[in-house]
């Protein structure tokens, strides 16, 4: 399991660690309108899954904005930003940041995504900063679990993986 720190304190990741080549497991999360959404709702598309501890922090905000801006130029690609923030907070953030079309999804109910992808920080009940790219066939083609929660992911590598997927 990947070693992760949050504000330089070690945390325990819970769930099933995912690797390149794995079939992407389905999960159920909630969108800003409190509707259930699954990974399968986006079958046939490349999915760049951007995972943030909380959308309303500087690094998480930058991560969400950057991936949405970069991926808007990619064909057949959707960016899914997932956190445990309540859907109301996600909706408010998107409005304040001028990103009404960003897809923000909440894993607050039962941590279905976090468990399936091995990114629950047990001590904090937050998701570890990470990125997964799933191709149109449902295979994981890129993974990154950022070792320090306050650091940025490798934006270029993730976008490049989405382009090739």
From Swiss-Prot:
EC number: 1.11.1.24
Keywords: Antioxidant, Disulfide bond, Oxidoreductase, Peroxidase, Redox-active center
Residue span, Thioredoxin domain: 18-164
Entry superkingdom: Bacteria
Disulfide bonds: 60-94
Cleaved signal peptide residues: none
Active-site annotation: 60 (cysteine sulfenic acid (-soh) intermediate)
Reactions performed catalytically: a hydroperoxide + [thioredoxin]-dithiol = an alcohol + [thioredoxin]-disulfide + H2O
CDD domains the UniProt entry points to: PRX_Atyp2cys
Molecular-function GO terms, alphabetical: thioredoxin peroxidase activity
EC main group: oxidoreductase
Pfam families per record: Redoxin (PF08534)
Role, per record: Thiol-specific peroxidase that catalyzes the reduction of hydrogen peroxide and organic hydroperoxides to water and alcohols, respectively. Plays a role in cell protection against oxidative stress by detoxifying peroxides.
Similarity field: Belongs to the peroxiredoxin family. Tpx subfamily.
SUBUNIT field: Homodimer.
Additional observations: The active site is a conserved redox-active cysteine residue, the peroxidatic cysteine (C(P)), which makes the nucleophilic attack on the peroxide substrate. The peroxide oxidizes the C(P)-SH to cysteine sulfenic acid (C(P)-SOH), which then reacts with another cysteine residue, the resolving cysteine (C(R)), to form a disulfide bridge. The disulfide is subsequently reduced by an appropriate electron donor to complete the catalytic cycle. In this atypical 2-Cys peroxiredoxin, C(R) is present in the same subunit to form an intramolecular disulfide.
Protein's name according to its UniProt entry: Thiol peroxidase
């Amino acid at each position: 399991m990947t070693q992760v720190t949050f504000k330089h304190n070690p945390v325990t990741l819970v769930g099933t660690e995912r690797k390149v080549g794995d079939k992407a497991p389905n999960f159920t999360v909630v969108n800003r309108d409190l509707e259930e959404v699954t990974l399968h709702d986006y079958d046939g598309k490349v999915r760049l899954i951007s995972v943030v501890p909380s959308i309303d922090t500087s690094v998480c905000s930058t991560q969400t904005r950057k991936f949405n801006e970069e991926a808007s130029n990619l064909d057949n690609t959707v960016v899914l930003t997932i956190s445990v923030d309540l859907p109301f907070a996600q909706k408010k953030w998107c409005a304040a940041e001028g990103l009404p079309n960003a897809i923000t999804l909440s894993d607050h109910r039962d941590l279905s995504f976090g468990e399936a992808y091995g990114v629950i920080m047990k001590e904090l009940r937050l998701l570890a900063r990470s990125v997964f790219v799933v191709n149109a066939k449902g295979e994981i083609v890129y993974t990154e679990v950022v070792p320090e929660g306050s650091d940025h992911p490798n934006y270029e590598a993730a976008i490049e993986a989405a382009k090739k997927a």
